[in-house]
């Protein structure tokens, strides 16, 4: 019996597409799905005429694979992954490799790696970005685990990943759960990107008064620039011309303004808090989705609470350009926060992440792919120990040149009652990061006053506590 090179468990659309991608690149595939009907449908249509072998039990599936077996699990994160692993364990042999390609919590990946190690089974936690289209035609892959396991899988990964000017969009991330952690932060950055674009759209539509055709033109032009050329700007431009065939109204205007989320943005915020890394733009993006979801409450509030009534009286063309500058400055800050989180996680968990390589593999295939990532890669290649992207000469100069427009846009939004939480959070991050003295000296004095938490001084070494109450009483 001829054995297959690679196996995929889970035939939802991502599993189907990545299986077809692997087969198209010359690796015979075996597939298994819990539901036989799903497997039958896949084999009858999309896999017809391909070198794909269907299995209808895990025993049959495992027996159809050459050793060491390479099995990609594409099922829902959490307990379903654990269930598949438990079912596979008695069927596999030492040296076989299980790859989790879902959006698993990185600590689950660490736990599974440790649990499988005594059995001799190898485990790879791999972030996969690019959605359905990327899975089929070339995603960005973020595999974490042992280096030897990655090297064994790299001939396949290098073929199926998106291809850019400097190679395939895959690299060895690091040990344990690092691959899933990097994918989580990628998704957090994606949240920030999408919220910043939404705020730019809101300003252009409701301050500048642009219609759908004009919005399409502006975003299309922005997508031709070095700084904003990206997949998300491209699809944003493509959304505006689509007219609902029934109402003849731009479809975007008919979509309910309540954004969903699957949890990776929230995870990013949670881990940042645990590691003590400020990511206010990404946090604002998560909060914006939460606020959008209480739509009925917002609609009721809009009839009770009033805001400014003023209209924008400035030059529309100049305002559009200022919004572009504000969007780019905010984007730099959002990515600076994401990279700072990766840097801290790398040090905390001893992952030795190469941040320049992270930027490189995000250049193609993934949702945040953008020309701007070349600049990030260059910054970290020139200085791998760079503490923050805001300190990179190019980004520093860009913000210095454009900060007046950035500030003007946020002031205008505030005057007109247009919420721009991610724009504002980005500017606050920039202003806080560049200050040599923040007002937290008062915060520390307050903590010492009510809780004797002590404080340090700028003029002498040591830790100090003051009996504030007697001093205050004496002043009365």
Spans of features found by a protein language model:
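NAD(P)+-binding Rossmann beta1-loop-alpha1 motif at the extreme N-terminus of oxidoreductases
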Residues: 1-69, 92-95, 132-135
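C-terminal amphipathic alpha-helical interaction region
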Residues: 400, 405-476
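Glycine-rich, highly charged phosphate/nucleotide-binding loops
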Residues: 53-60, 77-85
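Short beta-strand "acidic-cap" motif of Rossmann-like dinucleotide-binding folds
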Residues: 29-31, 125, 276
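Rossmann-fold dinucleotide-binding core
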Residues: 6, 81-84, 99, 105-216, ...
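Small-residue-rich helix-loop
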Residues: 222, 347-380
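Interdomain hinge/lid region at the active-site interface
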Residues: 180, 205, 225, 230-332, ...
């Amino acid at each position: 019996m001829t054995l297959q090179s690679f196996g995929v468990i889970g035939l939802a659309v991502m599993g189907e597409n990545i299986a077809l991608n692997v087969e198209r690149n010359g690796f015979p595939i075996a597939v298994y799905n819990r539901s036989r009907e799903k497997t039958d449908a896949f084999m009858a249509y999309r896999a017809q005429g391909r070198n794909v072998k269907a299995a209808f039990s895990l025993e049959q599936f495992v027996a159809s694979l050459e050793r060491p077996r390479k099995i990609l699990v594409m099922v829902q994160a959490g307990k379903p992954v654990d269930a598949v692993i438990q079912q596979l364990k008695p069927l596999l042999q030492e040296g076989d490799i299980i790859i989790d390609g879902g959006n698993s919590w990185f600590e689950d990946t660490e736990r599974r790696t440790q649990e499988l190690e005594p059995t001799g089974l190898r485990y790879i936690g791999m972030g996969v970005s690019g959605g359905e289209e990327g899975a089929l035609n070339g995603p960005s892959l973020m595999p974490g685990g042992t280096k030897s396991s990655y090297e064994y899988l790299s001939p396949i990964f290098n073929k199926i990943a998106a291809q850019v000017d400097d190679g395939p969009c895959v690299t060895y991330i690091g040990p344990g759960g690092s691959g899933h952690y990097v994918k989580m932060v990628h998704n957090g950055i994606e949240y920030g990107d999408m919220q910043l674009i939404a705020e730019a759209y809101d300003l252009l539509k409701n301050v500048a008064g642009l219609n759908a055709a004009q919005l399409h033109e502006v975003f299309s032009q922005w997508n031709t620039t070095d700084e904003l050329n990206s997949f998300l700007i491209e699809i944003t431009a493509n959304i505006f011309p689509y007219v609902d065939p029934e109402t003849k109204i731009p479809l975007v205007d008919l979509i309910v303004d309540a954004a969903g989320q699957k949890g990776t943005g929230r995870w990013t915020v949670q881990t940042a808090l645990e590691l003590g890394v400020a990511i206010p733009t990404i946090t604002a993006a998560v909060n914006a989705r939460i606020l959008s979801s209480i739509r009925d409450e917002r609609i009721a509030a809009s009839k009770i609470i009033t805001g400014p009534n003023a209209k924008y009286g400035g030059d529309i063309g100049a305002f559009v350009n200022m919004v572009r500058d504000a969007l780019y400055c905010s984007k730099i800050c959002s990515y600076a926060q994401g990279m700072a989180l990766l840097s801290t996680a790398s040090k905390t968990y001893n992952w030795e992440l190469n941040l320049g390589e992270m930027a490189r593999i995000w250049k193609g295939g993934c949702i945040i792919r953008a020309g701007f990532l070349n600049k990030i890669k260059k910054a970290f290649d020139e200085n791998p120990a760079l503490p923050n992207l805001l300190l990179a000469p190019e980004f520093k100069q860009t913000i210095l040149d454009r900060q007046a427009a950035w500030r003007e846009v946020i002031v205008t939004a505030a005057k007109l009652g247009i919420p721009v939480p991610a724009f504002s959070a980005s500017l606050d991050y920039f202003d806080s990061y560049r200050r040599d003295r923040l007002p937290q000296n008062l915060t520390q004095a307050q903590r010492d006053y009510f809780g004797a938490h002590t404080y340090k001084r700028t003029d002498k070494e040591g830790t100090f506590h003051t009996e504030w109450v007697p001093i205050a009483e004496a002043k009365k």
